Amino acid sequence: MSFKKIAEMMRQAERETKKKTLAFEQQAFEYNYKNGAIKITILGDLTLKSINIDPVLIDASDKVILEEMIIEATNEAVSDVKTKYDNLVEKTMPKVPGLF
């Protein structure tokens, strides 16, 4: 395979990756923590869009526990979206023998 062909493949992959990345960043992902006790919607660019807390969890005496659950749910949602992004990038990049 010629260097020119490889360079063109890389440019095409870069364009395709950029296009898919922009679409991914605007996509909303819903994450349900503990069977929907806390629902988090996060965008692909990791912007937190919404948090919905089951009213059963809202009790002033359990404030610390609720805060810990929100942090854990948010971190799990971010991790999930990062994994989906990594999978998207991996699928987009071309497989050039001997290059990577």
UniProtKB/Swiss-Prot annotation:
GO MF entries: DNA binding
SUPFAM superfamilies assigned: YbaB-like
Pfam families: YbaB_DNA_bd
InterPro entries: YbaB-like_sf, YbaB/EbfC
UniProt-recorded name of the protein: Uncharacterized protein MG134
